[in-house]
Amino acid sequence: MRKIFFVLFLSLLTSCSDDKKIDEPQITIGDNYDKKAMLVNWAENIIIPAYKNYQIEVNKLLEEVNTFKQNPTIDNLNKLRVSWLNSYKAYQHVAIFKIGKAEDLYFIGHSNTYPVNIIELNKNINTQNYNLTSLTQFDKQGYPALDYMLYGLADTDNAILVFYTGADALKYRNYLTDLVTDLKNNADLLLKDWEANKNTFISNTNNTSSGSVNLIVNAYIEYFEKHIRLGKVGYPAGKFSNGIQPNKIEAYFRKNVSKILLNEAISASADFFNGKYYSNNQTGPSLKSYLDHLNVQRNNKLLSTIISDQFSLIKIKNNALDDDFVSQINTNNNKMLEAYDAMQINVSYFKVDMLTALNIAVGYVDSDGD
C-alpha cells in the first residue's frame, strides 16, 4: 500500500507541476534504507561531537572574559577576541540542529540575532536591569552583542579599553561576563540533553513529522535557507528590501570575519549532507547515501552529485567575496547576489527534489516564496 500511495503521490505532484516545467527527480521506488544507522552516525559522530567542541570553545571564552575582567589590558582584549571568533565558528556547526531542547531554548535567537540593538543594549548596561533569558533580549545578547562589546564601543583599541577601566567599568565588565555566561549555560544544557536523549533520537525512525529524520532534515534545510542564504547574504545584500543593508551583516563591527563565518556554516552544511564525522574526514550513513540508495536522479545524474557539485560552486562564489562584506556590498553587490543565487539553487534541490524523494513534508513556514 505504501508503494502504491507513493506512486500516486508522485503522479499527482507531476500533474500539478506541469505548468511550472520543473524537472522532477527520478526515483527508484522502495525505501528499505537503514535510517537507524544514519541516525547513529548523525548523533554519535556529528552532532554530539560538535556540541562537545562548542562547549569547549565557550568555556575557553568564559576563561578569557574572566581574565580580561580581572586585568583589562590590550593584550587580554585581543586574546578574548580570538576566543570569541573561535567560539563563533564552533557555533556554526551546532546551530543547524534546531530541534528539541535547542528549539525550546530559542538557541539561535539567543546566540546570533543581528543586527544588534545598540540603544537597548546600552540601556541594559547602564541600568543593570535585564534578564538575558527573556525572549525580548535576542538583539542585545549572543555573539553579535559580543562583537559590539569587543569592537564597536569606540574606533580604537585604547578607546575601547576605557569603557572597561573608567567610571562605569564594572557595568561593562559585568555585562560582558553575563553575555558569555548565558552562552555557556545554553551550551551545557544542549550537550547534556543530547547525551541523555541520544538513544531516543536514534530509535525514532518513524517517517512522520515527529520522526528524527524528518525533524533533522527540516531543521537542516530551514537553517540553510533562512540563516545562511538569507541571514548571512540575502538580507544585507538587499535581496528582499528596496536597497542594500550592509548594517545587517554578521559580525558587523569586526567586519572582516563575515566571510569566515559564512564559509564555516557552508562547510558544516556540506559535511552534514555527506555524513562527514565532525572530528575527522571519515564518513558514515547520510543524506547523500540515502539518496544514492534510492537512486534519486535529476536529468540522469545522481541528485547527491548535483547537490555536492553545487556546494563546490557555492564555495567558489563565496571565496570571490571580499573579507569585509560591508565593503563588498558598497562596491560590488552583484557578487553578493551571485553567492545568494548559488545557495538558492541548493535550496531548490533540497526542498523540491530531496524532500520529494524522501517523502518528507516541509515542516516550517516558508516566508519568501521559495
Task: Give the role of each language-model region.
Residues E24-D370:
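Mature extracytoplasmic or organellar-lumen-exposed domains after removal of signal/transit peptides
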